[in-house]
């Protein structure tokens, strides 16, 4: 049944003006100016929860998603930790590694489960290499230590099927 809702998939919004005109572009329709009473922007991205990414161990204070850490540091002015480990080499993770360093934290490393970085090469250079932050590929967190507060994590190398390799565990405090 029709809901009367217009859906524009694969469309990038360029501007929403105060008079409710939506300037957008898509491969299929090109440039358009749409008008609407209400607009719902669905960007196609969301943070995955700890459960969705299968992080082991307990959830003590001191573990943040990239988005939460970004909000605390950039918007609220809080440093979320003095010693930082980042899991995931996406652009936000690398940008946060640099930002945390600039704010005075010691970023131990960025760990990526894949055998290749997932962010842009310029972010590897500008956010990690320029600040001496190591990037470890084919590694993941295999244990979290601490009850009330995070004390340490264990990282392990992974095989080509992304399974931890026994004997490669390293505790990072």
Label the model's feature ranges.
Residues 68-116:
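Rossmann-like NAD(P)H-binding beta-loop-alpha module
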Residues 1-83, 160-171:
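FAD-binding core/adjacent interface of flavoenzyme oxidoreductases
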Residues 40, 46, 77, 87, ...:
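Residue-level signal for well-ordered alpha-helical segments
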């Amino acid at each position: 049944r029709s809901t009367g809702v217009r859906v524009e998939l694969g469309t990038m919004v360029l501007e929403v003006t105060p008079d409710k005109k939506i300037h957008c572009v898509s491969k299929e329709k090109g440039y358009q100016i749409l008008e609407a009473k209400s607009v719902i922007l669905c960007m196609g991205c969301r943070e995955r929860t700890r459960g969705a990414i299968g992080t082991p161990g307990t959830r003590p204070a001191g573990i943040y998603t990239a988005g939460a850490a970004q909000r605390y540091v950039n918007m609220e002015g809080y440093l979320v930790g003095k010693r930082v480990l980042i899991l995931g080499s996406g652009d936000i993770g690398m940008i946060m590694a640099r930002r945390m360093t600039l704010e005075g934290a010691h970023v131990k490393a960025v760990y990526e489960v894949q055998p290749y970085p997932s962010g842009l090469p310029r972010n590897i250079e500008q956010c990690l290499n320029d600040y001496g932050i190591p990037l470890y590929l084919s590694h993941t967190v295999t244990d979290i230590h601490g009850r009330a507060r995070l004390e340490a994590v264990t990282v392990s190398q992974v095989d080509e099927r992304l399974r931890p390799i026994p004997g490669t565990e390293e505790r990072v405090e």
